[in-house]
Amino acid sequence: KLNAPHGLFEVAPGVHQVRGYDIANLTVIQGRTGWIVVDPLGTRDTAAAPLALARRHLGDAPVRAVIFTHSHVDHFGGIDAVFADPHVAGDLRIVAPRGFLEAATSENVMAGLAMGRRAVFMYGMPLPRDARGHVDTGLGKEPARGTVSIAEPTDLVDHTPQAMELDGVRFVFQYAPGSEAPAELTFYLPDAKPCYGAEIVSRNLHNLYTLRGAKVRDALRWSGYIDEARRLFADAEVVFASHQWPTFGKQRVAAYLAQQRDTYR
């Protein structure tokens, strides 16, 4: 039930998130002249629909930058929808963690067929959509099916903290390789004060060994990144992520990050 609400949600001033169109969330950050899109979902169609929804409510603006937070397909596979958007800027910047392209292609191309078959069982894809069949995946309703695409980053995040400005918006990035994904980042917006936890934080105990065959996660290292984010982004007033819903309030954010850190220790 908690994953069921879908639509466009305001997370912080100038920061909106579309939930319920894919297993992951698509985030739109308002820049000086356009949008920064974070994690353009898993397929072209599931990314195009949230972008259209955002335009209906937030107005038309060119996409100036895209951030791939990590190397799992549900966070980059819909990039073609951004390229196909008539409002996209010609000099689009694509930010990703160092090692993103290698990790994404090795997992989704070289091992893609085997992982795809296992994912059918892991996510219960053939089950009927009812109370006795497919209900939820925990992280979201269900993985998308459709055309998957990828793009080469123009800017790499390779250290912590790494400051960057995208269309007038100040970002502080955390480089978190070998956490929930082989290549991953999180970030903080020091002006609006939201912290984006990518997928190193969630509303469930995330799997350390995925049945579909993704690389095994180092729980202690992962926990260390969450603790680093808790200290680095201590002024955060909101924490939100690639899946599920935000936590509001500075004290609640600190408590949530501490609980997530301890979960993986």
Q: Model regions: which residues?
A:
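N-terminal pre-domain segments of enzymes
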Residues: 1-5, 226
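Conserved beta-strand hairpin/beta-sheet module of binuclear metal-dependent hydrolase folds
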Residues: 5-60, 185-199
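Second-shell loop/turn segments in exported
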Residues: 37-42, 66, 209-215, 254-257
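Active-site neighborhood of phospho(di)ester-bond hydrolases with catalytic His/Asp-centered motifs
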Residues: 38-40, 62-74, 95-97, 196-198, ...
